[in-house]
């Protein structure tokens, strides 16, 4: 069974917290991008690719704070933000990508790569603006998959389902 790894679950929890903090009715791709780039693992990957992570965070936060007034909740009562259709597409795409690569889990990198397909989103715009290269990320995921499979084949710890 394909499932999200623990790090990805934390990303989604933090995405919801970012939306709640701003009283947004919806969790958007931009909330997810913000949670991703604030995550130490993804932040380190982006830093290794020479991305100015601080500038990316600032751009996404500015967007969420100033351009999303139409999704601010009207009432004062606590509410749980809902996922947008584009966020559902993003997650489905990431799960499909992991499945086709023969992996048993979906990672934060899968979600980050999937953002590029949402061409009309500000999240994809910000990634391109900050010169995040989709192919570099895909190559990194592929390399990690090959290394994991090699370890399992050499008597290393087998991945679930590889017995």
Residue ranges and their predicted role:
Residues 1-163:
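Histone-fold recognition with a strong bias for associated Lys/Arg-rich disordered tails
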């Amino acid at each position: 069974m394909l499932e999200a790894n623990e790090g990805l679950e934390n990303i989604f929890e933090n995405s919801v917290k970012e939306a709640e903090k701003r009283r947004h009715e919806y969790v958007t791709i931009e909330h997810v991008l913000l949670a991703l780039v604030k995550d130490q693992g993804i932040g380190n990957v982006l830093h290794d690719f020479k991305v100015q992570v601080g500038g990316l965070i600032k751009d996404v936060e500015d967007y969420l704070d100033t351009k999303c007034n139409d999704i601010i909740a009207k009432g004062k009562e606590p509410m749980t933000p809902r996922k947008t259709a584009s966020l559902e597409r993003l997650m489905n795409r990431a799960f499909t990508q992991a499945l086709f690569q023969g992996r048993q889990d979906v990672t934060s990198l899968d979600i980050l790569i999937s953002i590029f397909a949402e061409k009309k989103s500000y999240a994809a715009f910000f990634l391109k603006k900050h010169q995040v290269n989709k192919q570099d990320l895909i190559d990194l995921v592929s390399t990690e998959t090959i290394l994991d499979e090699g370890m399992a084949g050499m008597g290393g710890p087998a991945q679930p389902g590889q017995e």
